């Protein structure tokens, strides 16, 4: 064994102790160093240990918080196809209420010997979560990429949409239609994308915004709820009750709930209330009315996540910073001129 370790160490340009840690699956070895040792095994004709053979089989984990929101299956499809084209097999791991947590899914994937993991809207987006979990994962030599969320505490590549720009697009569109009382329905404030959307919304609704005015805008025009149809319905009901003639929603599912809320109040969309979604989920163009929404660049984000992860796996890691992708406004049938603007020359 000593001779074998010495040969591998010499080929990889590392110490025998490092080779031993890699062969025994011990933490504390950088991903690039681990790959060098595995490459040395192959070059010298040594058979990889069983656990390391599983790792080299090309499994990549994809962790999502749910599949009920159609944006997550859309991400899974794009990422899965991109991985398959590169010879990797995606392993989808989804959290369920009362089921496995993100940490438990991570352990399952690591035990299966995945080459890396992509997290979509995971705990990295929650400002109250312990970010040390990602540092520990990196310490075990498992490359990972984080999609839709950001934390300066984590040294990893992040892939995000420009949430501030998304709100600016939505609000500017509604203002151009004559709306002056615009509400924002979105999820719990502890999430980074939510905080960024609020920033973009407030800045666009009232520029410049003083501290006092910002507080007033948030109190009157921002309603937090859940990222569900029912959550959107509840938030929109509250905003319409505050005389909003337009509602911007942080997801398409919430927007469908907002349309339901308006109808239950005897209002027509878009005649009485305009609604804008976010995501441009599959089939959303076929709702009644077809939903105006801000399109999240899912194909570009998903492909970038795969490309970045494969660079990490291949030993040429991407910069540990945030890659931001621009959204796009898609105007359909759920927005129209503000009620008071109709008939004006």
From Swiss-Prot:
GO terms for molecular function: DNA-binding transcription factor activity; transcription cis-regulatory region binding. Residues 5-24 bind DNA. The keyword Cell inner membrane does not apply. Keywords: DNA-binding, Repressor, Transcription, Transcription regulation. Residues 1-58 form the HTH lacI-type domain. InterPro entries: HTH_LacI, LacI/GalR-like_sensor, Lambda_DNA-bd_dom_sf, Peripla_BP_I. Coiled coil: none annotated. It comes from the Bacteria. PROSITE patterns: HTH_LACI_1 (PS00356), HTH_LACI_2 (PS50932). Transcription repressor involved in control of expression of alpha-amylase and chitinase genes and of actinorhodin production. PANTHER family: LACI-RELATED TRANSCRIPTIONAL REPRESSOR (PTHR30146), LACTOSE OPERON REPRESSOR (PTHR30146:SF153). This is HTH-type transcriptional regulator reg1. It comes from Streptomyces lividans. The lineage of its organism: Bacteria, Bacillati, Actinomycetota, Actinomycetes, Kitasatosporales. The gene is reg1.
